[in-house]
């Protein structure tokens, strides 16, 4: 799992707009 600056509503912070 790579750490991004955008925390999502999913499980992990991704390097993009990942809405789970």
From Swiss-Prot:
Disordered, as annotated region: 1-20
GO molecular function: serine-type peptidase activity
Domain Peptidase S1, residue spans: 1-20
Annotated coiled-coil segments of the chain: none
Domain of life of the source: Eukaryota
Protein's UniProt keywords contain Hydrolase: yes
GO process terms (BP): collagen catabolic process; proteolysis
Disulfide bond annotation, renumbered to this chain: none
Enzyme Commission designation: 3.4.21.32
Keywords: Collagen degradation, Hydrolase, Protease, Serine protease
Family statement: Belongs to the peptidase S1 family.
Function: This enzyme is a serine protease capable of degrading the native triple helix of collagen.
Protein name according to UniProt: Collagenolytic protease 36 kDa C
Source lineage: Eukaryota, Metazoa, Ecdysozoa, Arthropoda, Crustacea
């Amino acid at each position: 799992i790579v750490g991004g600056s955008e925390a999502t509503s999913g499980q992990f912070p991704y390097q993009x707009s990942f809405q789970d």
